[in-house]
Amino acid sequence: MKKLVGFLIILVAVVALLPLAVVFLRPNLIIPKAKAKEELSLPSSHFINWRGAELHYTDEGTGYPVLLVHGFGGSLRNFSKLDDSLRNEYRVLRVDLPGFGLSDFPEMGKHPQYVQMYRDYISFILDTLHLDSVYVVGNSMGGGIAWLAAADHPDKVRKLVLLNSAGYDVSNVSGKLTMFRFKSVGHVFDKGMPVFMSESGLKKCYSDPTKANPDTWVLNNHFTNREGNIQNMLALARSQQFPDTNIIKQVQCPTLVIWGKQDHIIPVEHAKKFKRDIKNCTVLLFDSCGHVPMQERPGATTAALRSFFAE
């Protein structure tokens, strides 16, 4: 009996430690920047230099410009599912935010100000690409950057679309990032992030995890494991820096807020707060949809964008 109990204890210990073994004993998953650029660029890819960093964006279609801004841990590929009809009618520009996708972080100094850096980056994009009149669409953290852009550039941002946007009480999100405040956690990812971690994180963004396509989390994992990206994301998460929510009230342009009702990341109640604080604001709620409506409900999202832009 004692031998059986001892065996069971050892078995439980092995099972408990198996995930750690997978993390620490796995091969190096980090993808060198040059290789990532070669293998993950698109035919519409462009690269520009800003503050010593190489930054990636895509430029497709003709017509009135639409700028798409992804969220934390994502890339411009997050918008790939939007119907081709959007690109057939508009000039669609997608950016990899600094520190994500194929974009580097610029030089930040000893006391980096991440919110201001992203504000400056969007200003740079608007000026460099001559976007003197533009519609801006942002998801999650990218939504927060989008409404900052609308407040900063009321003369340029003519319409704003927020998809499950960051903006208000972020304790639900920041609490999940608490572990990243410890620098020792970063060493767990010295060899990259296993694909099962990307899968687990992305499935939480869907109302129905079975709708998440394996190709999506594999691609996301490649971008996450691009040289430098994990440490950039960890640094951003540790900073716990968030924009001043009072700035939302400065948004003047017509705004469409789209929200998946089953968002497990940012509660749907936040949509009402945007409605309250932005004077010219319409809210559209999607059933059977989580945190990324442009991925889980791409057809409905595209239709809503086209209708709003045509008004």
Where are these regions (language model features)?
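Active-site loop/oxyanion-hole signature of alpha/beta-hydrolase fold enzymes
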Residues: 50-51, 58, 97-137, 303
